[in-house]
């Protein structure tokens, strides 16, 4: 069952009232990066190598950015602390989709905390203003959790 926004808002610090939706929380853009170079992924993560991220936008310094077709990494401004019995799923806001862009996200595991990063694919040029609400995250209760997230992205 989805955990309502009246509860899930407590997984964040410093939310604006406009971010609290019916059953989820809107997430705001903080930084946008271009991806350069090759990534490497394997079964054990021993060979894992992320490509280079080149920062092209920062909501703390920039007013807006026009993004052309392509793929980008978006880091959100909102710091999340997910409880040990909860998982999160992020989706693009419908306004973003209607403008010709989308986001791709992995599962936000129980115990994850930090500012998530998403892959944004732009099909039609789009202008994004600082702290624009681009995604909505919903949370679900998990039973029989095997453990909590302790990976390299925790706290980032």
Swiss-Prot record:
Alphabetical list of NCBIfam families matching this protein: PRK02253.1
Pathway of action: Pyrimidine metabolism; dUMP biosynthesis; dUMP from dCTP (dUTP route): step 2/2
Keyword Ubl conjugation among UniProt keywords: no
Record's keyword terms, sorted: Hydrolase, Nucleotide metabolism
Protein name: Deoxyuridine 5'-triphosphate nucleotidohydrolase
Subunit structure, interactors included: Homotrimer.
Gene Ontology biological process terms, A to Z: dUMP biosynthetic process; dUTP biosynthetic process
Reactions accelerated catalytically: dUTP + H2O = dUMP + diphosphate + H(+)
Function: This enzyme is involved in nucleotide metabolism: it produces dUMP, the immediate precursor of thymidine nucleotides and it decreases the intracellular concentration of dUTP so that uracil cannot be incorporated into DNA.
HAMAP family: dUTPase_arch
CDD domains: trimeric_dUTPase
Superkingdom field: Archaea
GO molecular function: dCTP deaminase activity; dUTP diphosphatase activity
Similarity comment: Belongs to the dCTP deaminase family. Archaeal dUTPase subfamily.
InterPro entries (alphabetical): dCTP_deaminase (IPR011962), dUTPase-like_sf (IPR036157), dUTPase_archaeal (IPR023537), dUTPase_trimeric (IPR033704)
The protein's Enzyme Commission number: 3.6.1.23
Gene3D superfamilies cross-referenced by the UniProt entry: 2.70.40.10
First-tier enzyme category under EC: hydrolase
UniProt organism field: Methanocaldococcus jannaschii (strain ATCC 43067 / DSM 2661 / JAL-1 / JCM 10045 / NBRC 100440) (Methanococcus jannaschii)
């Amino acid at each position: 069952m989805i955990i309502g926004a009246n509860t899930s808002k407590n997984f964040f610090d410093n939310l604006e009232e406009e971010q609290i939706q019916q059953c989820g929380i809107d997430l705001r853009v903080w930084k946008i990066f271009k991806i350069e170079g090759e990534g490497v992924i394997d079964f054990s993560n021993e060979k894992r190598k992320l490509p280079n991220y080149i920062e092209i936008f920062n909501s703390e310094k920039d007013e807006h950015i026009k993004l052309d077709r392509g793929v980008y990494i978006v880091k959100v401004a909102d710091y999340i602390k997910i409880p040990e019995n909860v998982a999160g799923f992020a989706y693009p806001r419908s306004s973003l989709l209607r403008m010709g862009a989308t986001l791709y996200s992995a599962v936000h595991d129980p115990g994850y905390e930090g500012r998530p990063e998403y892959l944004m694919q732009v099909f039609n040029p789009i202008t994004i203003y600082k702290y624009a609400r681009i995604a909505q995250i919903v949370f679900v209760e998990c039973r029989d959790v095997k453990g909590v997230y302790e990976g390299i992205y925790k706290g980032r």
